[in-house]
């Protein structure tokens, strides 16, 4: 979950019911007092969550979100539909959007040949096309994307532009090919800093 009110951000996995209720209470006390009139939310993983926590999250938090960002398996849980094709992604996105009354960005990274994501917002479908980057170090891609979207929303960009900028940032972090430790390591979140240093 990523909560952004103005320049503040809070990230973390909501693994239990008690944490989810605390998050909702915190969210209810934080309101933007400018033209936005509501908090910016980008919601991610159902992984590692207990079943009752998933149910509570769906009931209490999804209706408060500006956008939820499930991957394919998570979108299947939220929609109750199997996703095997692009058409399935569209049906699932529409179902989640109508059921929880929030925008939904279904991430297509679990498909083999591309990294195309589908946004359903205000009853409209928008595809964000991307190129799959052959990098084994993909730990935290979903968290990075949702955090980046929330950050750009907090800077005043609209949802579509926030997603475009977030996907560009994520692609850059993957393309940098940082290789730390063993297994599926992290991406290079500071790749833009390295570019600036090299220019200087």
Which functions belong to the PLM regions below?
Residues 123-134:
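Glycine/charged-rich beta-loop-alpha catalytic/anionic-binding loops adjacent to active sites
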């Amino acid at each position: 979950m990523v909560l952004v009110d103005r320049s503040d951000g809070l990230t973390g996995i909501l693994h239990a019911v008690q944490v989810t209720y605390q998050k909702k209470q915190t969210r209810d006390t934080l309101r933007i007092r400018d033209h936005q009139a509501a908090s910016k939310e980008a919601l991610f993983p159902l992984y590692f969550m207990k079943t009752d926590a998933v149910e509570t999250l769906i009931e209490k938090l999804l209706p408060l979100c500006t956008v939820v960002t499930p991957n394919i398996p998570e979108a299947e849980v939220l929609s109750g539909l199997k996703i095997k094709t692009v058409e399935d992604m569209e049906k699932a996105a529409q179902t989640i959007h109508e059921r929880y009354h929030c925008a939904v960005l279904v991430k297509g990274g679990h498909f083999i040949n591309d990294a195309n994501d589908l946004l359903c917002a205000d009853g409209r479908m928008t595809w964000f096309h991307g190129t799959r980057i052959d990098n084994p170090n993909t730990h935290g891609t979903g968290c990075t994307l949702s955090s980046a979207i929330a950050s750009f929303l907090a800077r005043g960009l609209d949802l579509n532009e926030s997603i475009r900028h977030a996907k560009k940032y994520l692609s850059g972090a993957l393309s940098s090919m940082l290789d730390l430790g063993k297994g599926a390591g992290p991406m290079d979140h500071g790749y833009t800093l390295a570019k600036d240093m090299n220019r200087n």
